[in-house]
């Protein structure tokens, strides 16, 4: 058996081709941790119907950003950078909740290396049962079914880690540098939305998001900022305000320069590359903004990788 520790990065994943869009959506809508559609025994059937209906418009969006999600390559780049920072004694792997490499495939790869100790590190900074909770539940299911004996430590949040906050602030400064020095720029944090019912039932996601924003904005004294939520879908009540609503509100109040900061995302994927860079950018143009920009995503930011390394080292103590 190897004395090394496996670091397993948990991420949602994304389709790696246009043909993968529909099966990816089936996997997503089949997950009862994220959405409950009817009785459990019917959900896989209903998920297939929803995925079939939504596949074509979603495929068009992926076609506009290169025909696939970049999230696998970016997560693997994060894993490689993290392994280099951690040095000997660690091997990094990735597990995607709704696509490949699956949790089953990741554990098989760890097992082939003869590693028995795992630090499962969620790449969702803000805990929610719909994101980290789902990935952890899937990992526990696969572990139970495998019959393998692993010593697993879970890192399920890092919304207030100093280096994560510093990494976000660095990217915001890069975004602000794209504006004229004398321009009055406001900041709009845009986080992935969540049904309000999750928060009402005690999910800490919203409080984690708000604390991240507070800590980041301590570094930008005097700058006006807002928080909104994107990517909502379906008829249930979602977190408010929506990003579209805030864009319209700010335009109506004569805001002309806006920097959008993707929050709750640590790498580029469809929500940044299409929803923000294309859809919201077009809306901002129609609403009359003089300049609308997005701060760069964390991806392999050295500060962010240092944050992950610190989380791993502390989990391994």
Swiss-Prot record:
Cellular component terms per the entry's GO annotation: cytoplasm
GO biological process: heme biosynthetic process
Gene3D superfamilies attached to this UniProt entry: 3.40.50.1400
Reaction(s) the record says it catalyses: heme b + 2 H(+) = protoporphyrin IX + Fe(2+)
Coarse class of the protein's main subcellular location: cytoplasm
CDD domains: Ferrochelatase_C (cd00419), Ferrochelatase_N (cd03411)
Record keywords, A-Z: Cytoplasm, Heme biosynthesis, Iron, Lyase, Metal-binding, Porphyrin biosynthesis
Family as reported in the entry's similarity comment: Belongs to the ferrochelatase family.
Classification via PANTHER family: FERROCHELATASE, FERROCHELATASE, MITOCHONDRIAL
Name the UniProt record assigns to this protein: Ferrochelatase
Natural source organism: Geobacter metallireducens (strain ATCC 53774 / DSM 7210 / GS-15)
UniProt gene name: hemH
């Amino acid at each position: 058996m190897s004395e090394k520790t496996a670091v397993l990065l948990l991420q949602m994943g994304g389709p790696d081709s246009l043909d993968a869009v529909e099966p990816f959506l089936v996997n997503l809508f089949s997950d009862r941790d994220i959405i409950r559609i009817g009785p459990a025994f019917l959900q896989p059937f209903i998920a297939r119907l929803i995925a079939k209906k939504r596949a074509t418009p979603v495929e068009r969006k992926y076609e506009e950003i290169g025909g696939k999600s970049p999230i696998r390559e970016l997560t693997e780049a994060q894993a490689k950078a993290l392994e280099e920072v951690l040095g000997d004694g660690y091997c990094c792997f990735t597990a995607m909740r709704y696509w490949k490499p699956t949790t089953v495939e990741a554990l098989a790869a760890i097992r082939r290396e003869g590693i028995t100790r795992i630090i499962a590190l969620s790449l969702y900074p803000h805990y929610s049962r719909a994101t980290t909770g789902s990935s952890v539940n899937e990992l526990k299911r696969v572990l139970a079914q495998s019959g393998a004996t692993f010593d697993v430590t879970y890192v399920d949040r890092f919304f207030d880690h100093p280096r994560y906050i510093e990494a976000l602030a660095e990217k915001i400064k890069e975004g602000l540098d794209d504006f004229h020095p004398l321009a009055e720029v406001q900041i709009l944090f845009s986080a992935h939305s969540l049904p309000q019912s999750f928060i009402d039932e005690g999910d800490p996601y919203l409080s984690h998001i708000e604390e991240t924003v507070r800590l980041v904005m301590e570094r930008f004294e005097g700058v006006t900022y807002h928080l909104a939520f994107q990517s909502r879908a379906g008829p249930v009540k979602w977190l408010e305000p929506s990003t579209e609503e805030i864009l319209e509100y700010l335009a109506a109040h004569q805001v002309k320069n806006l920097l959008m900061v993707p929050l709750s995302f640590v790498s580029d994927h469809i929500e940044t590359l299409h929803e923000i860079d294309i859809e919201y950018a077009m809306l901002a143009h129609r609403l009359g903004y003089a300049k609308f920009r997005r701060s760069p995503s964390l991806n392999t930011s050295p500060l962010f990788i240092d944050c992950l390394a610190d989380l791993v080292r502390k989990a391994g103590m």
